[in-house]
């Protein structure tokens, strides 16, 4: 599995050229993309500027010597490469297994070309087997948890040890065990309109390419109506 993730990440790095501002994703597959960019910066003199999606990726990029800028200091990003936890046939996806969904979506929004790197196990018929992360403000989080519980969403707080996990943005994550999300777009709109929800892990209609690594090789899928 790790070998497939590495292949996908390295393949995505081939889309990066000199002078680009690039979004650096978070997670086990995006990790290999960032590593490959770091190698090219060091060995090939690749000239890029990175915008990171988490404190973890920031630390990784700094160690590798990749120059970084804040999202507030750029107007657009040429290319962002990130992982995904599930991708359906309509190129909607669930992200946030690494608890970085808010920053990931902020970086994805001004991106000209958005690529996901996954292994074949992440490609699914319907989203929802992977729990949907919902980032919520700490104030009123328990009330919101009960709202989700009453709606039948089978919520659970994301934990770190014995305590609730706190994101880089100082929020909590409530994971929803939905089983199958029949209409991801409609459910995303429902969550968008829920007071106390900062962001959710449904990335609908955002991705341009999905690089899928399997035992048979690498496939690049093009989203027909991205953006």
Curated annotation (Swiss-Prot):
InterPro entries assigned to the protein according to its UniProt record, in alphabetical order: NagB/RpiA_transferase-like, Ribose-5P_isomerase, Ribose5P_isomerase_typA_subgr, Ribose5P_isomerase_type_A
Pathway where this protein functions: Carbohydrate degradation; pentose phosphate pathway; D-ribose 5-phosphate from D-ribulose 5-phosphate (non-oxidative stage): step 1/1
Binding site for substrate: 26-29, 82-85, 95-98, 122
Record GO biological process: pentose-phosphate shunt, non-oxidative branch
Highest taxon above the source species: Bacteria
EC id: 5.3.1.6
Keywords on record: Isomerase
Pfam family, one: Rib_5-P_isom_A
Active-site residues annotated for this sequence: 104
Isomerase among keywords: yes
SUPFAM superfamilies: D-ribose-5-phosphate isomerase (RpiA), lid domain, NagB/RpiA/CoA transferase-like
Entry keyword Isomerase: yes
Record-linked HAMAP family: Rib_5P_isom_A
UniProt similarity note: Belongs to the ribose 5-phosphate isomerase family.
Function: Catalyzes the reversible conversion of ribose-5-phosphate to ribulose 5-phosphate.
Subunit relationships: Homodimer.
Protein name: Ribose-5-phosphate isomerase A
Organism: Streptococcus pyogenes serotype M1
Taxonomic path: Bacteria, Bacillati, Bacillota, Bacilli, Lactobacillales
């Amino acid at each position: 599995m790790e070998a497939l993730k590495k292949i996908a990440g390295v393949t995505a790095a081939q889309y990066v050229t000199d002078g680009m501002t690039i979004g650096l994703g978070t997670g086990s597959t995006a990790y290999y993309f960032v590593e490959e960019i770091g190698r090219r910066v060091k060995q090939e003199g690749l000239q890029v500027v990175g915008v990171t999606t988490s404190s973890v990726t920031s630390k990784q990029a700094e160690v590798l010597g990749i120059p970084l800028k804040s999202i507030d200091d750029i107007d657009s990003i040429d290319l962002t490469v990130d992982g995904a936890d599930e991708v359906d046939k309509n190129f909607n996806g669930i992200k946030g297994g690494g608890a970085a969904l808010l920053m990931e979506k902020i970086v994805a929004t001004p991106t000209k070309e958005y690529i996901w790197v996954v292994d074949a196990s992440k490609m699914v018929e319907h989203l929802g087997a992977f729990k949907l992360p919902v980032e919520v403000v700490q104030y009123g989080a328990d009330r919101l948890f009960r709202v989700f519980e009453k709606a039948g969403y089978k919520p659970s707080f994301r934990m770190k040890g014995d305590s609730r996990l706190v994101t880089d943005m100082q929020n909590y994550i409530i994971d929803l065990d939905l089983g199958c999300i029949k209409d991801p777009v409609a459910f995303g709109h429902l969550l968008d309109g829920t007071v106390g929800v900062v962001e959710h892990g449904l990335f609908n209609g955002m991705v341009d390419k999905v690089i899928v690594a399997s035992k048979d090789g690498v496939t690049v899928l093009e989203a027909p109506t991205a953006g």
